């Protein structure tokens, strides 16, 4: 169950702390001080979820001392994270912890942008409903540290595929790494890809780990060194162990920054009464990219409940930027940023990087698609093209719900590659909602398509020429995605001047998500266009 009241946060040595007792476990959280401005640049997606399974329940002072002396506090501080100490509420401790204990822990952890002191606020944007406080953390980066009795529990119960509450609902919650010290039982290893640290264990126990794909055997744990040398690279994403990219090895740069913008009159976020506010971003580019002259810029906007790193790493924009040699800048907390302010960010980026002003593109997933559409309809002269994904927002209001009639673009064509999932539960395709059809009709009008979408009626969708879009493209292409067993079907629409600058695509078997296959095909189409 979520915490409906915010826990009391106390000052402690080198940071802050708080605690809470849930039904199945007691939790202590230590949030070490750091030099990062996590409210501007959100590091949560790549931050480790450091779970210390206490052998015996200890007080807060002892927990803080362990975090600091072990180096785990330093690991947490380096990524604006926390150290979590967990102990069962069962009367006989770990011996009484059931198989569902870990799922109960994970159910109280969420990765949401709005957070403070290691606590996130879960507010449903669409339902306008507060759903409680949760522990901040990335459950796909769960690193478990266990000792003696707690290690025995891990060895018997957690080295297997586990189900529970994942990011978007029920799903796999298998940990990325399990560290076990002073085991007294042979581990039951039913899954070989989980990263394992075996420290201070017998040769017999260590032999039981033979066959593990990611194994570090040590006489004694060295937590900070082990993290940076072994643990850091692992994440368990959607049931598969994956490696985080090593940007120096790839000859790439990942760079955090922010721009101070003048708050625009249409900003309805918590910054609406501030004269200025900060907009954070992370930039990704190949080293030496500017040596050959000005470079294309793709500015990206993440989905609701996500962060800039989600768009970068899950959608794979960093890989597309690496492979196709452009600058990718992912904006943080854009839900607090208007289109006017986003243009200010672009203006400042042009001062910091050698950007080709004729090749500036925008993209966004879900709620970030809404921000991309805002730029299309309010500032078309800035962009050479847009690549919104998985959301067809209403036309005549901004992301904040404010009318934009004064700035609504009606005359400036902007190249578009839009893609949506055929099995999504949100309006991603015209067939799914009349507001989605309205967006397509608007693009058709602005880009002056030969096909007359204005004649398409939502109520006639069962008899549409094309069951998803209403009208088929002048040309159609099907691009298989073998990695997901799906097909990207692209409809290309010609404008009245004979130029094809509009592509609407659907992805079979896709729900509400953003895939590298789709965005890379979007880039291949959009990158051909430049501003005059």
Predicted segments with their positions:
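Short beta-strand/loop motif that positions the catalytic acidic residue
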Residues: 196-199, 417-420
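A conserved short beta-strand
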Residues: 164-184, 188, 381-396, 414-415
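Alpha-helical scaffolding within the catalytic cores
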Residues: 65-73, 182-189, 309-318, 345, ...
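Acidic catalytic loop of the alpha/beta-hydrolase fold
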Residues: 201-203, 422-428, 511-514
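Conserved acidic catalytic loop of the alpha/beta-hydrolase fold
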Residues: 101-140, 341-358
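A domain-start/cap signature at the N-terminus of enzymes
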Residues: 1-49, 97-108, 118-128, 140-166, ...
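Short substrate-entry loop that stabilizes the transition state in hydrolases
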Residues: 36-47, 52-95, 289-295, 300-337, ...
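Alpha/beta-hydrolase
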Residues: 52-54, 180, 301, 389, ...
